[in-house]
């Protein structure tokens, strides 16, 4: 075991993911998830030394109770592990325009995360709680906390990609522009794709698709992001689990003026009641959609809209590749595991010279990476992401 392990924290609005990782080799010594915060069934699950355990946190518990449990109960089982933690890495969804790369956390960074909270109101306030609790529980690491931003990798986008066609003063005065998300994942699979394709990252032209409950596509030219599907917030772009993705902005006026919905209700609908959930009227789970595609109209409808939107983005981003597209990459929970999403999407992209090999496509699931295209056709690659490792490596590098 290395003496320089990193505790990685990912605080969501109602959950906390945590892991202790060796940044040198990626070995994971502890991983866990606390969820259902503020509810009677708040609970925590973890895996330590290969053994899975679970406990109730108590009704109404949240980030504070979860981190306290991790330190005083889980790590108490293995004090030598706690002693090896040399840094803490925090996943931060939105860094705005000021926080453009991973950075050691100080008061100015905390203020920057607060300033960007209006662009990620569900996530950034939760991240700030996580930082505060980490500082309380690990006072000896007060100068070893590092923020890693989901928006950072997309900061190489040119102006024509990140500006909206709105009055320019909205950007100049209020930072209204496209920022993207899932940048840590897009960055990781870009590095891995370079290895798989045996190319230097700086020569790589790829389109990366991070598909999970949230989803985004990125255009990577010469190893740098030049466009991505999420915008000012993670609501823009693809069809997602419960998020609408792209829509005509005038739909909002229709919902308000004609149907009498208030702004809060519209926001709730677009973020929590749309996407696969809205299209099926049953669930946000892609597995339901895949399992029932041939037998239920709601599942077919949702899958077809999902794949149509995804194919449109891949097709449009091919125009940004300077005439050479090296590969299309799939990652994230759906991207790594749904052979159906990949096949139905890629079948729409014959113009790009893409042909799916059915056998390879079925094989590249459940943590297995691999090429899924037919030999001699445009490379398409499934790569499991590892955002936690990137966060651990950045935290280790910046606090060394």
Swiss-Prot record:
Residues bound to substrate: 91
Keywords attached to this entry: ATP-binding, Cytoplasm, Kinase, Magnesium, Metal-binding, Nucleotide-binding, Transferase
Site feature: Transition state stabilizer: 182, 243
Assembly behavior: Homodimer.
Function: Catalyzes the formation of acetyl phosphate from acetate and ATP. Can also catalyze the reverse reaction.
Signal peptide residues on this chain, from the entry's feature table: none
Positions annotated to bind Mg(2+): 10, 387
Active site, per annotation: 150
GO biological process: acetate metabolic process; acetyl-CoA biosynthetic process
Cofactors required: Mg(2+); Mn(2+)
Disulfide bond listed as a keyword: no
CDD domains associated with the record: ASKHA_NBD_AcK_PK
Keyword Nucleotide-binding found: yes
Species this chain originates from: Erwinia tasmaniensis (strain DSM 17950 / CFBP 7177 / CIP 109463 / NCPPB 4357 / Et1/99)
Cofactor details (free text): Mg(2+). Can also accept Mn(2+).
Identification of the protein by name: Acetate kinase
Catalytic activity: acetate + ATP = acetyl phosphate + ADP
Binding site for ATP: 17, 210-214, 285-287, 333-337
